[in-house]
């Protein structure tokens, strides 16, 4: 849209981390481009790229963080809440251990927002991420809540976020364990109503398993009897 020259290197078209070290790749790309966006699994990869590229490196998604998605989500919440960010409450429900749960917790803590997570304790962010969030909240005045009760997590909230329960690359067998843990954390009409806020809005970074119109959605329905997974 802005007229930049963009080159896309897909996994099959690059030897990064395989036949060529991250360091060497960073140095070469840094001489060819004005900026690099990395979207992949390892947080350590994007950090090493940033150390050696000599140009700005953007995290487009890793296993730990999804900052570009969070910037878009913040803009959306600002546009649709009618409140300053510091007065806006939002809740993440589901598996909170990975990039979306981590990023939503930390950005809310940084910006002084009312930030909640509703998840089984086994699926909370790591102790290190939680400690970082509390440290940021002490400076910003953010209100943080981590609870295993999804009803408590959404009470009075302005936005309810969720994400898929099984990430790319995880084996199919994981579905059984995740669904057993997370059945009570699906975003349903009842959970939206539990917010007690007629203006509450739903957010998802997508793609979402919300019906039977995909192969996975149909398999989930036949196997577990669920029409939709994390949201219905």
Swiss-Prot record:
GO terms for MF: amino acid binding; ornithine carbamoyltransferase activity
Gene from which this protein is expressed: argF
Name the record gives this protein: Ornithine carbamoyltransferase
Phenotype upon changing residue 93 to I: In strain: NHITCC 2376
Binding site for L-ornithine: 99, 163, 167-168
Annotated site, Important for structural integrity, chain positions: 79
Family recorded in the similarity comment: Belongs to the aspartate/ornithine carbamoyltransferase superfamily. OTCase family.
Example GO biological process: citrulline biosynthetic process
Any Gene Ontology CC annotation: cytoplasm
Entry's localization field: Cytoplasm
Stated consequence of mutating residue 81 to C: In strain: NCTC 11050
Reaction equation(s) it catalyzes: carbamoyl phosphate + L-ornithine = L-citrulline + phosphate + H(+)
Sorted UniProt keywords: Amino-acid biosynthesis, Arginine biosynthesis, Cytoplasm, Transferase
Keyword Heme in record: no
Enzyme class: transferase
Outcome after substituting residue 51 to C: In strain: CCUG 4557
Name of one Pfam family that matches: OTCace
Ligand binding (carbamoyl phosphate): 15, 39, 66-69, 204-207, 232
Entry-linked InterPro entries: Asp/Orn_carbamoyltranf_P-bd, Asp/Orn_carbamoylTrfase_sf, Asp_carbamoyltransf_Asp/Orn-bd, Orn/put_carbamltrans
């Amino acid at each position: 849209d802005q007229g930049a020259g963009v080159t896309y290197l897909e996994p099959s078209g690059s030897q990064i981390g395989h036949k060529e070290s991250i360091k060497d790749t960073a140095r070469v790309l840094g001489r060819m481009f004005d900026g690099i966006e990395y979207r992949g699994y390892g947080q350590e990869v994007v950090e090493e790229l940033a150390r050696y590229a000599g140009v700005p490196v953007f995290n487009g998604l890793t296993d730990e963080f999804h900052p570009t998605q969070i910037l878009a989500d913040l803009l959306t919440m600002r546009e649709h809440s009618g409140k300053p960010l510091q007065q806006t409450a939002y809740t993440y429900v589901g598996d909170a251990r990975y990039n979306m749960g981590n990023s939503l917790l930390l950005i809310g803590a940084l910006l002084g927002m009312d930030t909640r997570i509703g998840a089984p304790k086994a699926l909370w962010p790591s102790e290190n991420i939680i400690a970082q969030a509390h440290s940021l909240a002490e400076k910003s005045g953010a209100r943080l809540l981590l609870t295993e009760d999804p009803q408590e997590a959404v009470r009075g909230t302005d936005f309810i976020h969720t994400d898929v329960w099984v990430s790319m690359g995880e084996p199919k067998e994981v579905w059984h364990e995740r669904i057993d843990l997370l059945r009570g954390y699906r975003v349903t009409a009842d959970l939206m109503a539990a917010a007690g806020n007629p203006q509450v809005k739903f957010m998802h970074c997508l793609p979402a398993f919300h019906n039977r119109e995909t192969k996975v959605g149909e398999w989930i329905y036949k196997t577990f009897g669920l029409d939709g997974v994390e949201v219905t």
